[in-house]
Amino acid sequence: MMYFVISAMKAQIEIIPCKICGDKSSGIHYGVITCEGCKGFFRRSQQSNAAYSCPRQKNCLIDRTSRNRCQHCRLQKCLAVGMSRDAVKFGRMSKKQRDSLYAEVQKHRLQQQQRDHQQQPGEAEPLTPTYGLSTNGLTELHDDLSGYMNGHTPDGTKPDSGVSSFYLDIQPSPDQSGLDINGIKPEPICDFTPGSGFFPYCSFTNGETSPTVSMAELEHLAQNISKSHMETCQYLREELQQMTWQAFLQEEVENYQSKPREVMWQLCAIKITEAIQYVVEFAKRIDGFMELCQNDQIVLLKAGSLEVVFVRMCRAFDPQNNTVYFDGKYAGPDVFKSLGCDDLISSVFEFGKNLCSMHLSEDEIALFSAFVLMSADRSWLQEKVKVEKLQQKIQLALQHVLQKNHREDGILTKLICKVSTLRALCSRHTEKLTAFKAIYPDIVRAHFPPLYKELFGSDFEQSMPVDG
């Protein structure tokens, strides 16, 4: 029986930071190791032959936080480190290039090991490339689709025909909490039973699962989840707010609309997969998640990861212009027209707008995301009671934070009501993928990210273990 492939795959190329901005890289793009953001920026600059100007002295610092402030200096750095449109097509790397790349990978891996060794217990660890997006078998989109369709990996070799190299890494992360719960006196006690009405939207198997939780434990859990959320966000909220003015121009919108349907689907599948990798790391850092059995960790991630992506999307949503951050700029629904999923896109944007209208803080987004992820009513759970207890504690922590933030009465109920909307969105996404797969089975099988296929493929039910 096929099963969900798990591996603590060692990061290879992705361990080397982006040569442009220093962010987490996703592979070799246009001949240089870069992140997805810089790859997309360079592609757009070449497609539009843009003539950027620098408002300063043409020596702007380009890093993860400043890369969107000066397009001129960012493009100059791309060119200076060797990014080139021709590099996409030059094929197999020379032995000298491979040896040089291998040496650099080894150097960064050694540096990573040294940092890990020096890491103090409880100290926050930055995101590592262990959950990053592997681009084996994937190259540039649209203009570069011909090379991609030939099925070559970035080093010019044919991809493996066996097990995919795309893995969901649920190996334990080091302690990320930075909090010391030892010695906290559990004086104030919250004892909530299902009969009390505190969990009106949760269906629990028996009254014995109701948690007895100290206020100190709730505070600790809330801090742990909030910290885990902030450490695993793709973008800081401040960065996103600074970029809201960078909306796609009409010419760029038409460029997306003219993409072949399969190319746009592939692009969106890659973007969703990238976001899900961050959700996986978020889950691993939540107190209690790694104590669940491996089967249940997988079930929760497979069933809930896209729901959390939709929740997190509200951070990157601009309700005033009805746009969302996508592929380097803010995009309206019309950017996604070539997908052929207008109803789904409309519903996703409507959900983002509605969630934005609740003006959730980062803490509240974090706890609601954790609550959604730890849903105890998922099929195939082996230790349902254990998951129920964890979800109940998270809901208590969410209510604790809402009360501490002086939120209006009824907001918890409104949030929990969003769960059914999230599930409807994800169900519709699966329906659209199934319809697309029926028309383009070879594209999905050969060219979509393997993790995306594992999460949303129609063989999900057959691949899950059967109890008893």
Curated annotation (Swiss-Prot):
One record GO biological process: rhythmic process
Zinc finger (NR C4-type): 18-38, 54-73
Record's keyword annotation contains Transcription: yes
Main location: nucleus
Domain NR LBD: residue ranges: 217-455
Reported tissue expression: Expressed in the brain, in cerebellar-like structures, including Purkinje cells.
Protein name per the record: Nuclear receptor ROR-alpha A
Source organism of this protein record: Danio rerio (Zebrafish)
Species classification: Eukaryota, Metazoa, Chordata, Craniata, Vertebrata
Gene this chain is encoded by: roraa
